[in-house]
């Protein structure tokens, strides 16, 4: 069941979008996406992330506080505005609707695919947009690609006691 509210999603031409094929089930990938406190482990552009509510399952209306990796950056409050269990988690900035982070898991038989879209405004007119594209947005795009490789490693890692010494 799709649970959503607010305006229909408008995709910005400036949004960063990356995807990664996963050799794991969509359920395992979505479980990892829903573990907000673990986001800094695989999202390398974040220093911290935490939920503001009681810690129940992530759902529509849940609030998440994120701090980026830029030194001196303040914490930003986001709200889950779209949630489709097993498939979509979409965050929108609580104070700026132009700040958005979307996670989508696509099922492909025994494999899956994660698609992440990050969008934020660039202020300062044409010059500010140009400077942002040459500096911060380029770095963020590279970090997003690295982050999805980290996610792939975490979600595909299967270590049981019998697997530890399997090579010996």
Where are these regions (language model features)?
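Beta-strand/loop substructures that line and gate deep hydrophobic ligand-binding cavities in soluble
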Residues: 92-146, 162-165
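Hydrophobic ligand-binding cavity/cleft-lining segments
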Residues: 1-54
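A general secondary-structure boundary signal
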Residues: 15, 19-26, 73, 90-92, ...
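Short phosphate-engaging motifs
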Residues: 25, 38, 72, 97, ...
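Glycine-rich portal/gate segments that line the openings of hydrophobic small-molecule binding cavities
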Residues: 3, 41, 50-100, 108-109, ...
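Generic structural detector for well-ordered beta-strands
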Residues: 19-23, 79, 104
């Amino acid at each position: 069941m799709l649970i959503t509210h607010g305006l229909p999603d408008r995709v910005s031409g400036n949004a960063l979008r990356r995807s990664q094929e996963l050799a794991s089930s969509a359920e395992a990938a979505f479980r990892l996406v829903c573990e907000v406190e673990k986001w800094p482990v695989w999202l390398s552009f974040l220093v911290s992330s935490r939920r503001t509510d009681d810690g129940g399952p992530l759902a529509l209306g849940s609030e998440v506080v994120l701090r980026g990796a830029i030194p001196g950056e303040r914490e930003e409050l986001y709200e889950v505005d779209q949630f489709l269990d097993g498939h979509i988690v979409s965050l929108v900035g609580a104070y700026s609707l132009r700040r958005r982070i979307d996670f989508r898991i696509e099922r492909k038989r025994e494999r899956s695919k994660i698609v992440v879209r990050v969008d934020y405004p660039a202020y300062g007119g044409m010059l500010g947009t140009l400077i942002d594209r040459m500096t911060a947005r380029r770095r963020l795009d590279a970090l997003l690609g690295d982050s999805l490789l980290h996610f792939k490693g975490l979600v595909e890692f299967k270590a049981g006691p019998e697997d530890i010494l399997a090579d010996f």
